[in-house]
Amino acid sequence: MNSLKNDRYLRALLRQPVDVTPVWMMRQAGRYLPEYKATRAQAGDFMSLCKNAELACEVTLQPLRRFDLDAAILFSDILTIPDAMGLGLYFEQGEGPKFSKPITSMADIQNLPAPDPEQELQYVMNAVRTIRKNLQGEVPLIGFSGSPWTLATYMIEGGSSKAFTKIKKMAFSDPQALHLLLDKLADSVILYLNAQIDAGAQSVMVFDTWGGVLSPRDYQDFSLQYMHKIVDGLTRENDGRKVPVTLFTKNAGMWLESIAATGCDGVGLDWTIDIDNAKARVGDKVALQGNMDPSMLYAAPERIEQEVQKILAGFGEGPGHVFNLGHGIHLDVPPENAKVFVDAVHKYSAQYHKG
């Protein structure tokens, strides 16, 4: 495998010294880029884009051609695992992902197959291999999965939800069924992420988009314990290097200590917590990723630079910070504003890495 020309992102996640703070953006390959829209039109639809290794590679690399990013992230979707389990994933215009065969009973859960990453999900591994080859060692490649709880919300609700009544009904009326589903999903995520690592992913991330809708005790019970199981089951070294793992739960500022205690290397932060507060609480255990409000990218360039400086100052000196947005970049953000953001991180962070 190629040696890395820029390993800042991996070093920061392992809390090792870097020259400047590394930066990437969640959803950095996406609809805010005109070249992405053109490639997606060529593919026909979103899942066809995900399933074509050459096109998935192309959209993964597009933001790296525009911006001085310190990592690439696999272009895929968090719902690949439930799709491979046969739930009939489809996308409705303006409504997001839906499943034609949602989970409604214990029998549905017992009958779920365990997808083989090199069979039903081989298209993802082919994309990882293609991207890794085409990156030519410029920056590391991040692989990812949804968390068991977040995957289960889509599988039981049948798509996106605001109230999560169906999954919470199962959680509180038939917890045994939900725990069986979450356990099966954790096993599948472990297989899936380890296959991505084998295929060339140099770091992995678990996105727990909907963990924040749970009470503190239910978060531990239905979300965090399964992410802990995943962390324990991951390949943590490959090709002579450590493979860092980052956990990201949206709206989880109150649970940082518990997340850090899983043994992960990095914790993703959304914008609802101050990074200095997060560092004071868990900075001696994990790296922190984040955490500018993605909507700040609508602001004037000077305002974006001010916000970057504020977050850098909040984290302060020393390693262990990967700069990112607090969630995915919005689809109508001007690409030039994203460039202001990325360049500002490198420009203003060097002063914090002189030691």
UniProtKB/Swiss-Prot annotation:
Q: Name one GO molecular function term.
A: uroporphyrinogen decarboxylase activity
Under the heading CDD domains, the entry gives: URO-D
The cellular location(s) given in this protein's UniProt record come to: Cytoplasm
EC number per UniProt: 4.1.1.37
Q: Which reaction does it catalyse?
A: uroporphyrinogen III + 4 H(+) = coproporphyrinogen III + 4 CO2
Q: Which residues bind substrate?
A: R27, Q28, A29, G30, R31, D77, Y154, T209, H327
Residues spanning the membrane:
none
Look up the record and name the pathway of this protein.
Porphyrin-containing compound metabolism; protoporphyrin-IX biosynthesis; coproporphyrinogen-III from 5-aminolevulinate: step 4/4
* Recorded GO CC terms: cytosol
Question: Which UniProt keyword terms apply here?
Answer: Cytoplasm, Decarboxylase, Lyase, Porphyrin biosynthesis
Do you know which InterPro entries this protein is assigned to? UROD/MetE-like_sf, Uroporphyrinogen_deCO2ase_HemE, Uroporphyrinogen_deCOase
- Tell me, what's a Pfam family for it? URO-D
Output the GO biological process annotations, alphabetical, semicolon-separated.
Answer: protoporphyrinogen IX biosynthetic process from glutamate
Q: Where is this site: Transition state stabilizer?
A: D77
The record's comment on protein family reads: Belongs to the uroporphyrinogen decarboxylase family.
Q: What does this protein do?
A: Catalyzes the decarboxylation of four acetate groups of uroporphyrinogen-III to yield coproporphyrinogen-III.
Q: Which NCBIfam families match?
A: hemE
The record's HAMAP family line, in alphabetical order, gives: URO_D
Q: How does it assemble?
A: Homodimer.
Protein name in the entry: Uroporphyrinogen decarboxylase
- Organism classification, top ranks? Bacteria, Pseudomonadati, Pseudomonadota, Gammaproteobacteria, Alteromonadales
What's the name of its gene? hemE
